[in-house]
């Protein structure tokens, strides 16, 4: 929806604005004196600056920090001013265009600068060819050149060969691989011997337990101890008495009893 001009005139707009400001003040403060409250704030805080009109002057310029001095041993660069384009002015630009014809552009780089630039280009190769201190230095030593700085920051080792940091020689890798292969071969042969020994060994015969009735519900581990079998005892010999004397005595007693009864009658 596009913007439309207000329906009230200037006096009506001021009245609406004043009432809206009073109502907004009453929404957060109950003093009831909007004008006095505003005057007290103006005395304490001062009048704020009005908003910057559109298209006005820009803000404060950003301060440019000066460039750091070049490190020792680094290639020297061509000094130029802040507003000067790269490669110098128009005359320098013309000299650079005529450098192929032997112009004055050759004076921009001195032989020392060219030598330093070539040293920087050969830095990766030089890093891999730098020997390692053996034994390592323990006392601090002042750094005098770039090569010495690289030599001091590189991790020391005792290997005799020269290689980049974090790599090993091909010969040492081959020896390590051969050692691992031998260990794997020994382990494989040992496992095969154990497997063959288990196959040749005869299994133990299983002993069948006799079936006993009434032991289906017996709890394991709580069996009654078996009693020892008793030795067979020989039967005792009984004494035999004579039956004839006993029978004769019994008959005599009975006859005496009968005779006594008859006499009494």
Curated annotation (Swiss-Prot):
It comes from the Viruses. Residues 44-110, 152-171, 194-265 are annotated as: Disordered. Residues 48-60 have a biased composition (Pro residues). Keywords: Phosphoprotein. Phosphorylated at C-terminal serines. Pfam families: DUF755, TT_ORF2-like. Residues 152-168, 243-265 have a biased composition (Low complexity). InterPro entries: DUF755, HEV_TT_vir_Orf2/Gyrovir_Vp2_N. Residues 221-242 have a biased composition (Basic residues). This is Probable protein VP2. The lineage of its organism: Viruses, Viruses incertae sedis, Anelloviridae, Alphatorquevirus, Alphatorquevirus homin6.
């Amino acid at each position: 929806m596009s913007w439309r001009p207000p329906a009230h005139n200037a006096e009506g707009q001021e009245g609406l604005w004043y009432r809206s400001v009073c109502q907004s003040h009453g929404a957060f403060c109950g003093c009831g004196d909007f004008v006095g409250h505003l005057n007290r704030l103006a005395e304490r805080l001062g009048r704020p600056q009005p908003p910057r009109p559109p298209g006005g002057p820009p803000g404060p310029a950003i301060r440019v920090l000066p460039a750091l001095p070049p490190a020792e041993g680094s290639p020297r660069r061509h000094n130029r001013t802040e507003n000067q384009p790269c490669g110098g002015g128009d005359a320098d630009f013309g000299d650079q265009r005529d450098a192929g014809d032997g112009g004055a552009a050759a004076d921009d780089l001195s032989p020392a600068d060219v030598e330093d630039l070539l040293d920087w280009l050969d830095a990766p190769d030089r890093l891999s060819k730098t020997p390692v201190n053996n034994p390592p230095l323990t006392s601090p030593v002042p750094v005098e050149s770039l090569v010495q700085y690289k030599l001091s920051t590189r991790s020391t080792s005792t290997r005799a060969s020269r290689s980049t940091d974090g790599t090993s020689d091909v010969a040492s890798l081959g020896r390590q691989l051969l050692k691992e292969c031998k260990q794997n071969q020994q382990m494989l042969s040992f496992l095969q011997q154990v497997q063959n020994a288990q196959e040749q060994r005869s299994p133990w015969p299983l002993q069948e337990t006799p079936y006993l009735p009434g032991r289906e519900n017996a709890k394991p581990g709580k069996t009654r101890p078996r009693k020892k079998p008793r030795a067979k005892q020989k039967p005792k010999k009984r004494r035999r008495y004579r039956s004839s004397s006993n029978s004769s005595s019994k008959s005599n007693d009975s006859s005496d009893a009968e005779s006594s009864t008859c006499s009494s009658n």
